[in-house]
Amino acid sequence: MQLRVHPTMDCSGRSTSNIERDSDLGDDLSHGDRTDDEMRDCDSVDGEHHQLSAKAAIAARLSHTVSGGGGSFASPEPQTELPLSHHHQLPPNHPLNALGSFMGIGGLHSIPNLQHSDVLEKLKMQVRDMKVGLMEQDYAAAAHAAAFGANMLPTTISSGFPLPHNSVAFGHVTSSPSGGNGSSYNGGTTPTNSSNSNATTNGGGTAGPGGTGGSGGGGGGGGGGGGGVGGHQFSFASPTAAPSGKEARHFAANSASNSSTSSEASNSSQQNNGWSFEEQFKQVRQLYEINDDPKRKEFLDDLFSFMQKRGTPINRLPIMAKSVLDLYELYNLVIARGGLVDVINKKLWQEIIKGLHLPSSITSAAFTLRTQYMKYLYPYECEKKNLSTPAELQAAIDGNRREGRRSSYGQYEAMHNQMPMTPISRPSLPGGMQQMSPLALVTHAAVANNQQAQAAAAAAAAHHRLMGAPAFGQMPNLVKQEIESRMMEYLQLIQAKKEQGMPPVLGGNHPHQQQHSQQQQQQQHHHQQQQQQQSQQQHHLQQQRQRSQSPDLSKHEALSAQVALWHMYHNNNSPPGSAHTSPQQREALNLSDSPPNLTNIKREREREPTPEPVDQDDKFVDQPPPAKRVGSGLLPPGFPANFYLNPHNMAAVAAAAGFHHPSMGHQQDAASEGEPEDDYAHGEHNTTGNSSSMHDDSEPQQMNGHHHHQTHHLDKSDDSAIENSPTTSTTTGGSVGHRHSSPVSTKKKGGAKPQSGGKDVPTEDKDASSSGKLNPLETLSLLSGMQFQVARNGTGDNGEPQLIVNLELNGVKYSGVLVANVPLSQSETRTSSPCHAEAPTVEEEKDEEEEEEPKAAEEESHRSPVKQENEDVDQDMEGSEVLLNGGASAVGGAGAGVGVGVPLLKDAVVS
């Protein structure tokens, strides 16, 4: 047998003693981790002859052992052709034949004659992929038996020479080999000695015969070995001659890093099947031959060797526009402009694209060039030029991304600037909204200090969420939707807080954060105000969730943010995406089904509340608390809180924004009494299970353990809303807006209708029609143009708290009295206060939700007449009033709806 080892087998196996088996043939089988690092250090393939001699000695021993000592060890010298002393027709049980039949590769018997590195590499790769190679002896035996047939397994799997336990001694040991614990592999006739990673690791005799550069361009050739298979000597020397030239050196250096194939091509072939050495060599040659500039070759040699040394060899060259990316020109163009960081910051990619003569049709050329430069050239730039640091690069990339995001806000900002700001909204909404940036979300903690920043952050959050969802309609619609979503989030937060007896906190980048802090505070309030243990427990659950979600925000900031958002919401004259809003209302009942789509949920809920009288009653109860909040306009400070807390408004906003589903999710848990309400279920809770009545609410809360937050809204949140709401007028505006938001409340109206029962059914129908008319979009549009003013906050003739409110919507002025829902006696007395919303207000006053459950039923009955009365009003101002009341029309059309949505305008007068 002739076994020739090329002397230039340097890095492929530096250490003959430190060899680890690798379960995957694709890896460097013949060297351990240490040798891998060492091999990476070698730049060229021509060195370490002393190691070679050691390898040669081991290989000689191996070949003697395998072939019975008949092997002749040829002096190491480069050779292009390796004589193969074996029959071209291999015995049927020969590993190559077996491999051919196993892998479906024909003509493997003639492989020894082929001096084609491509075939050799591919074959190696495939065998490697089959994981035929260095393995534990038992595993190797089993795998070999499975792959090549048990008849081919050597009687003993052992190497004929003592090798380190991890060393590989491949060889056909069919001729009884002397003992040894090396895992000699049946499939490989080439004994791969520990240092000699080449060839046989590739799975039985596949590695051997190769032409020059066969197993590796780097020529980390593998020692050949002869195994007597069926009496036929199959000696094949792994190709050791490396392709001449710098390319060969680079490849050899790369190949050294994985000694199993000793070639970069084999490296890449391991990663990408079909990526042959020849193709890779062609690529590199193209790169060198783009022009004859000597500096190009110098640079490329330096670059390849540098990347090899740092352990990240360039295995595949990037391709752009169907040709190899000219790394030399790219590097020069970037360096001439101050380095990668400057190019990114100054946006000079178009110049570089032109300099590289890339077609302008490439859409993401700048991004691709940046990523390829970062991968292949930036480490080299840092080493040679030191123009920037990786930290500066990351900062530049992040800054670029932020700018890209800002551009998407440009339209929104323009819309915001164009939006007429209502007097209320202007003070509450500082110009900071325009300064909103994506960073607001990230740095919400820092931004929390300023209300404007908070509002901006909320807007950014809404925008990003909306961006995640399919875009609906035009940008103006999107903006509206964003505002709606923000409002929904804020409302939810307020509701949660009020439930917990906390003042609503709308400020803060994330309503959820506010909710958490609010909920935490609310938990305290709950403990203090424990009206209903169940509701408190529910609050606690919500609070915990909220706590986990966000940091606490100052109440004042939160309130300011609420007002600002509300104003923004109002100011959006462009109707929110009608598609968005209306679907939300329609899907009100589906909240449980599609928590992410508030719009869908809202719509479903609106539809469903009617079928679910009890749930609707509960919803009414929940909704009334918001109404109370609205009604708590009676208590000007609490009015905004009430308004925000209004479940209808929240639901509408949430549906529109698809936003509050996180915060809603907590509340929904509470309200998941009969329906899996979506996260947006704050408002939805009211619609689904909590709106039956505030009183019912306490029961549902007990039942659901989730309505608690709504019930609390009715009791505590209403009270807290009254107590905490600092800006009555603003709040009123907000509450009115919320009523408009009442598209959600319209759903609630539907719910209320079922509550009211048969006599309300017609009203319900009307409300249904009105609610149908009032899309969240319509509601929002109405809200955006509505002026809300509390003319008087006092008590009525019967001593009940009431608000005299003036509304101007679409040029029509409405004035009316909002009556707080008082305990049963009061609510009964107050037939005109059919609004459940008012009931929540009364409940706030009472903090007697438990008592109110029965009251709620009575109130509902009262409401029905009132609703009927309101129906007339609604008929008069169905479009506008419904929006105003969040169910004013609902109040008339759906008394329950009114109760749910807002306190009824007792005397709705169209001026």
Swiss-Prot record:
CDD domains attached to this UniProt entry: ARID_Dri-like (cd16881)
Biased composition range(s): Gly residues: 202-231
Domain ARID: 293-385
GO molecular function terms listed in the Swiss-Prot or TrEMBL record: DNA binding; DNA-binding transcription factor binding; transcription cis-regulatory region binding
Tissue spec: Present in the pharyngeal muscles, hindgut epithelium, amnioserosa, ring gland, midgut-hindgut junction, posterior region of each brain lobe, longitudinal glial cells of the CNS and the salivary gland duct of germ-band retracted embryos.
Gene3D superfamilies: ARID DNA-binding domain
List of residues that carry Phosphoserine: S30, S44, S592, S594, S720
Knockout or disruption consequences: Flies show axon guidance abnormalities in mushroom bodies and pathfinding errors by photoreceptor and subesophageal neurons. Female flies with retn defects are strikingly resistant to male courtship and show male-like courtship of females and males, especially as they age.
UniProt-listed InterPro entries: ARI3A/B/C (IPR045147), ARID_dom (IPR001606), ARID_dom_sf (IPR036431), REKLES_domain (IPR023334)
Signal peptide bounds: none
SMART domains: ARID, BRIGHT
GO cellular component terms given for this protein: nucleus
Feature: compositional bias, Basic residues: 737-751
Phosphothreonine: modified positions: T35
Ranges annotated as biased composition (Polar residues): 570-600
Biased composition (Basic and acidic residues): 19-34, 601-621, 854-870
Domain of life where this protein originates: Eukaryota
Composition bias type Low complexity, residue spans: 174-201, 252-273, 512-550
Annotated stretches, region: Disordered: 1-44, 67-87, 172-274, 501-633, 662-775, 826-877
Feature: compositional bias, Acidic residues: 841-853
Domain REKLES: 731-825
Record's keyword terms, sorted: Activator, Developmental protein, DNA-binding, Nucleus, Phosphoprotein, Transcription, Transcription regulation
Pfam families: ARID
Cited function: Transcription factor which is a downstream target of gcm and repo. Directly or indirectly activates the transcription of locos and pros, which are essential for the development of some glial cells. Plays an essential role in defining the cell shape and migration characteristics of longitudinal glia that enable them to establish a normal axon scaffold.
Protein name: Protein dead ringer
